[in-house]
From Swiss-Prot:
It comes from the Bacteria. This is Uncharacterized protein sll1770. The lineage of its organism: Bacteria, Bacillati, Cyanobacteriota, Cyanophyceae, Synechococcales. GO terms for molecular function: ATP binding; protein kinase activity. It comes from Synechocystis sp. (strain ATCC 27184 / PCC 6803 / Kazusa). Belongs to the protein kinase superfamily. ADCK protein kinase family. Signal peptide: none annotated.
Amino acid sequence: MSALSTKLEPTNSYSESLPPQRRSPLEAEGRYRWNRGNYSITRRRIDIWGFVLTLLYQFWLNGKKWSYAGGYTEEKLQQRRRRQAKWIRENLLSLGPTFIKVGQLFSTRSDLFPAEYVEELSKLQDEVPAFSYEQAAGIIEEELGKPIAKLYRSFDPVPLAAASLGQVHKAQLHTGEDVVVKVQRPGLKKLFTIDLAILKKIAQYFQNHPKWGRGRDWNGIYEECCKILWQETDYLREGRSADTFRRNFRGEDWVKVPRVYWRYTSTQILTLEYLPGIKISHYDALEAAGLERKELAQLGARAYLFQLLNHGFFHADPHPGNLAVSPEAGELIFYDFGMMGEITPDTKNKLMDTLFGVAEKNAERIVNSLVALGALKETEDMGPIRRSVQFLLDNFMDKPFEEQSITKISDDLYEIAYDQPFRFPATFTFVMRAFSTLEGVGKGLDPDFNFMAVAQPFALQIMNNSNGFNPAGNIMDELGRQAVQVGNSALGLPRRIEDSLDRLDRGDIRVRVRSTETDRLLRRMGTMQMGTNYVLFTCALVLSATLLFVNNYFMAAAVVLLMSLVPAFALWRLLKRLERQDRMF
């Protein structure tokens, strides 16, 4: 089996995305147990469950104030979470492809995890060794049914990039076209099958957990992860996504998308047009090529708004490794179409209803649209959720436009979601993640870049076209819209009254009249009375132990002193309960 090495251009974004130590075909020498052909399934279970149970112990420890040296503070909790987040990221890397991808998916789920974990998971990049050229060639020949020499005029044995799911080689077809060949990692589907079976048990454990299962659909999250992971192993699907993406930008000369060579593509092999470019985060190279960084930042934002608003089909992983710029014309080049998002027309309409609610600062409309989207679970009392949304609106809308940040908005939204029954669909989190990542890329190119400022004209145009909001202040249109809204509310009122009465009949709604302040004071007085009893009991035992000790009854004194620890511990528990009650009111 022969192969001809080809000299790689320095502007190739695939090679630039690799750390220096990985720009050669690193052999998988058993550094990771999952990478061995004969790894033990039992050992795999031990590795995964060991990680999960250790993580749960750390979560439990976070809530224990005695575990903080020098006393608990919010700052110490954040510092501990940051350390834990790094530990989580390192362990996900060592657990291999399945958990690297799960970690990357969880980096979009700030509604599930604290901000410190999500921030660290967003840095999670594939750091696994490349597999050998012999393995890659064997997979290509088995999938395409021909020897390497008959398929390609030349094939570089040194991968341009290696990741958890596969690696990319440069090659040249016999017809003269330069291509990149993406080869799936050997044994990947077997590993996914084992890992996902274990993850199913973990999801069930979390679902039944008294704290972590409350208000969370872990089984649904597991199913979502399964779907996305298996989709990423199908390179035919990725090829179709690349084709659709290329078609959507066909009339735009400022974006380039690689062409798929279907004759050289299968479920485990993807052959794409070779489009070299300057990595979008290599600022010195961009300036040396005479490209304007500020314009590139605007171009990236424009490309994503075009994807989302014009076609509803968008690239869900726009990190700098997947974006490059052609040095000649400054065109934006997209790579890697394994993770794509799609918004259906119905979802788009519901999202627009949310946007209208934001424009009107109408928390009621936003909450109703989020319920319709399936992003919010309807509860008996939606009042706290409406107040949380209204608080976010008041803080967001009252700021000058240039101070608004898509990252800050999504962080605030996720902070509310973390304590409320939100369950953001994957598409929503992909959109927020893509926009947040893109804002980071834009600020790297231009420190003054503001994604919201770029998005404003697009949003206003769509709202005008939808007749949902008229910033120009056309009074008659606005009155007509308000009349329709009032009419809809009036028509829906009998149904809402009937629903409320039905819920009263079923006992789902309980009406209770009480004095909250009086109840609180009575509870506090009862607790303090009990605390006084514990203090007296403890003091009596300590005094008894002291008298016994003075009279040389050392053993009896030790026993009585140990007995005094029981009411002392009960007193400590009582004081903690009082502290919690004070925080609640």
